[in-house]
Amino acid sequence: MGSKTLPAPVPLHPSLQLANYSFLQTSNGLHLPADHMPSIYSFSALHAVHLHQWTLGYPPFTLPRCTFSKLPGLVDARFPLPSIPLFPHLVQPAKQESSGPGSGASSKSKPRFDFANLAAAATQDDALKAEDLSTNNGHVRSPSLGCLLDVAKLSSPERKPSRGRLPSKTKKEFVCKFCGRHFTKSYNLLIHERTHTDERPYTCDICHKAFRRQDHLRDHRYIHSKEKPFKCQECGKGFCQSRTLAVHKTLHMQVKELKPAKIK
């Protein structure tokens, strides 16, 4: 069974001061001027016409130029029609479209809503809206859509901060006033500056030899006590300083590398 478009329902509005319902049926194809509408019918009549257009799914009520004399027999003379200013949300004037090669194809009239096939009509309406959005992708967007896009940009992955550790704080650098060398600790800077000033605050009680660092004085005291706490595990030789033992171990490693070469 084919779809059949139902006739337009008669809007029941008590304040609609029109002669008969033929005005609404005629207004679908009639073009009325926006500046002459207050002299034809009142505010409530405009509201009823607006609801009539919206219910049937017609496009906005475009009103080109014409005169009141071209409307004979549409309005009953027995009912006075007061002049009330129009409001932009009730009657929307037609927008001036720029004349161009694609201007005629861009203007599409919205089809009537088919009450017999509600599901098909609703699906068709959504498809048209999606098509309009796709065609207007390169044109100027509305402010509300722009705000939504701005919010979407803010929530996009590109704007989100990277997870994980926060960036490390800038470390305090201690700069030598003599050579400009940087140090992360003040103690290291103090020891380094003593190389420039030749300051040796740590002195041996036995031989009165001075040292820049306290650990150097501690290692020196092992010489006088003849105590050698750092001993080599391979040859048993003792050393007063750990760094001297480290240099000694490198000699053993070099000997082990030379032995396989001699055997070959």
UniProtKB/Swiss-Prot annotation:
The keyword Transcription applies. It comes from the Eukaryota. Disulfide bonds: none annotated. Disruption phenotype: Embryos show a down-regulation of early pronephric markers lhx1a/lim1 and pax2a/pax2.1, and subsequent kidney defects. Pfam families: zf-C2H2. One of its GO terms (molecular function) is DNA-binding transcription factor activity, RNA polymerase II-specific. GO terms for biological process: angioblast cell differentiation; intermediate mesoderm development; kidney development; mesendoderm development; negative regulation of DNA-templated transcription; negative regulation of transcription by RNA polymerase II; pattern specification process; pectoral fin development. Expressed in the germ ring mesendoderm and subsequently in the endoderm and intermediate mesoderm, prior to the expression of definitive kidney or blood markers. At 60 hpf, expressed in the glomerulus, in some patches in the eye and brain, and weakly in the pectoral fin buds. The keyword Repeat applies. A zinc finger (C2H2-type) spans 174-196, 202-224, 230-252. Keywords: Developmental protein, Metal-binding, Nucleus, Repeat, Repressor, Transcription, Transcription regulation, Zinc, Zinc-finger. One of its GO terms (cellular component) is nucleus. Its main location: nucleus. InterPro entries: C2H2-ZF_Transcription_Reg, Znf_C2H2_sf, Znf_C2H2_type. It is found in: Nucleus. Belongs to the Odd C2H2-type zinc-finger protein family. Transcriptional repressor. Regulates mesoderm versus endoderm differentiation during gastrulation to regulate kidney versus vascular cell fate. Acts upstream of pax2a in kidney development and functions in glomerular maturation, after podocyte specification. This is Protein odd-skipped-related 1. It comes from Danio rerio. The gene is osr1.
